[in-house]
């Protein structure tokens, strides 16, 4: 079964800790990490978009949502605003390009417990909020615009000050995040194990 909720892969970050664009790193049998994510998430969602600064950096076909050109920043805030402007749906599933081990069961659980009365339904692992893994509702659109105006880009702060429902998970490996070169190498080893 494919979910109707649109999925957004956020791939517009600066990747400064990685030293190169992590979305474009080879991953498994795929030319890029973002293609790996796109392939796997397309088995879960009917519609998958890639949120990015510039779609021209990708040499494959996909549904892209580019950040608003007047926003010269590398923060998810810009991506979220563009997504809200582009989509007509009330909600969407947000996932970061650098978390390739999020499982179908995690996504299903988040989608099943989500309610229209929530502003967001977000994963938590060992008490730590995972703001780039969860469902965001249109009710947060105005708050994202305010954050941008205030040059505030902390998703955790936004979620703590909104009607957010958290879902606790225990499997830390599923939330493994690729920020540094050694984490990329660890992820490749995990993928091949």
Swiss-Prot record:
Q: What is its EC number?
A: 2.7.7.77
- State where Mg(2+) binds: 98
Q: Cellular location of this protein? A: Cytoplasm
A GO molecular function term, named singly, is: GTP binding
**Biological process terms in GO annotation:** bis(molybdopterin guanine dinucleotide)molybdenum biosynthetic process
Cofactor(s) needed by this chain: Mg(2+)
Q: How does it assemble?
A: Monomer.
Q: What is known of its domains?
A: The N-terminal domain determines nucleotide recognition and specific binding, while the C-terminal domain determines the specific binding to the target protein.
Q: What does this protein do?
A: Transfers a GMP moiety from GTP to Mo-molybdopterin (Mo-MPT) cofactor (Moco or molybdenum cofactor) to form Mo-molybdopterin guanine dinucleotide (Mo-MGD) cofactor.
- What is the name of this protein? Molybdenum cofactor guanylyltransferase
The organism named in the record is Sulfurimonas denitrificans (strain ATCC 33889 / DSM 1251)
């Amino acid at each position: 079964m494919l979910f109707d909720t649109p999925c957004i892969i956020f791939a517009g970050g600066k990747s400064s800790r990685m030293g190169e664009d992590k979305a474009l790193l080879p991953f498994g049998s795929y030319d890029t990490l973002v293609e790996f994510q796109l392939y796997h998430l397309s088995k879960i969602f009917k519609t998958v978009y890639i949120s990015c600064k510039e779609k021209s950096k990708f040499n494959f076909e996909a549904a892209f949502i580019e950040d608003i050109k007047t926003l010269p920043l590398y923060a998810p805030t810009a991506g979220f605003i563009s997504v809200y402007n582009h989509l007509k749906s009330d909600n969407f599933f947000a996932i970061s390009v650098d978390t390739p081990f999020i499982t179908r069961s995690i996504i299903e659980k988040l989608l099943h417990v989500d309610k229209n009365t929530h502003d967001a339904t977000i994963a938590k692992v060992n008490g730590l909020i995972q703001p780039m893994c969860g469902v965001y509702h249109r009710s947060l659109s105005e708050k994202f615009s305010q954050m941008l105006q205030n040059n505030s880009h902390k998703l955790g702060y936004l979620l703590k000050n909104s009607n957010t429902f958290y879902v606790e998970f225990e499997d830390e490996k599923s939330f493994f995040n690729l920020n540094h070169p050694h984490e990329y190498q660890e992820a490749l080893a995990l993928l091949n194990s």
